[in-house]
Structures are given as C-alpha cells and as structure tokens.
Amino acid sequence: MMDELSEDMAKGNGEALTTYAVVLGVQPQDREHFAAVTHEHFSEIFNKSDATAADVYANTQAILKQDARLAKYAEQA
C-alpha cells in the first residue's frame, strides 16, 4: 500500500491516494484539492526512502494543518 500511495501522490492522483483521502475523512468536494496539496508536498510527506506508515501519516497531518481548506481534516492534537 505504501508503494502505491507514494506513486499516486507523486503523480497527483490514483486509487491509493483517493483511498487515503477517504480514510482521513476528506469529503468528496475536497479530494481534488487534497491530491494537489499532497502532490505539491510529496517530498515533505515521504521525506525518506524508508518512510513508515506512521511517518507518512504524521507528515500528512502537518501538511493538512498548514492548508486553510484541509486543516479541518487534520487530527486535533
């Protein structure tokens, strides 16, 4: 799953990326924006070649919190 997600995020679309958005609770109207933002910040989300699911999740949360439209989907810490 991580390989598929990284490939989809790198290109900005795909089934794994859509599934990730759904798991995070991103509503359909915001999924295109989610794909664009995660694509733009790919190197920050997958910041090392051996990134774990926990790394990717934490990095995604950090990116979501920085985006006005997507912040509502970030986990409240």
Model regions: which residues?
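Mature extracellular/secreted ectodomains of secretory-pathway proteins
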Residues: M1-A77
